[in-house]
Amino acid sequence: MKIFGKWDPTEVEVRDLGIKRYVSLTPVIVPHSSGKHARQQFNKSEISIVERLANNLMRTEINTGKKQKTLRAVEEAFDIVSKKTKQNPIQVLVDAIANAGPREEVVRLKYGGISVPKAVDTAPQRRVDTALRYISMGTNNAAFKSKRSVAECLATELIGAANRDTKSFAINRKDAKERVAKAAR
């Protein structure tokens, strides 16, 4: 069974062992589960990673609830990625998530009346969530008031994040977050 009838998720390899358990590559024709996993706290890791990307793209006010439109944009973006990189676009998505997820973050601890930043390791589930959020934010920011379509912007963001390109919004955000954490050690 192939996603969108084109790409086989079984040939995709998650190279980052930390997030392997949280990136679901279950083969589905149309990535639309109707929120079946919303009842349990951490069951979102069982939803297909392509559907989670589409759900994150629906965050802005004008796209809220327009899943078919978003899935069409994701499919077009995967076509563009496939043509540009000659790779399985799901593999590019997984590599982009692995590269865009921050490994270290900052928490604020209060000692007396003073708040002190402290660097902490990021949980794998949060790394995946944050990476998906950064990729979708970068896509929405690039497509807003632009002649480029959402699909083109998503394809550019995915390819940039998969290649660790600092022009990518997701990689830029991740580096900034890790830089702050390094300063707070």
Curated annotation (Swiss-Prot):
Taxonomic superkingdom? Archaea
| One Gene Ontology biological process | translation
Keyword ATP-binding listed? The answer is no
Which molecular-function annotations from GO does this UniProt entry contain? rRNA binding; structural constituent of ribosome
What InterPro entries does this protein map onto?
Answer: Ribosomal_uS7 (IPR000235), Ribosomal_uS7_arc (IPR026018), Ribosomal_uS7_dom (IPR023798), Ribosomal_uS7_dom_sf (IPR036823), Ribosomal_uS7_euk/arc (IPR005716)
Pfam family of the protein (one): Ribosomal_S7
Supply the SUPFAM superfamilies for this chain: Ribosomal protein S7 (SSF47973)
Q: Which residues form a coiled coil?
A: none
Keyword entries, A-Z: Ribonucleoprotein, Ribosomal protein, RNA-binding, rRNA-binding
A Gene Ontology cellular-component term: small ribosomal subunit
Stated family: Belongs to the universal ribosomal protein uS7 family.
Q: What does this protein do?
A: One of the primary rRNA binding proteins, it binds directly to 16S rRNA where it nucleates assembly of the head domain of the 30S subunit. Is located at the subunit interface close to the decoding center.
| NCBIfam families, A to Z | PRK04027.1, uS7_euk_arch
Q: How does it assemble?
A: Part of the 30S ribosomal subunit.
Protein name per UniProt: Small ribosomal subunit protein uS7
Please name the source species. Answer: Methanosarcina barkeri (strain Fusaro / DSM 804)
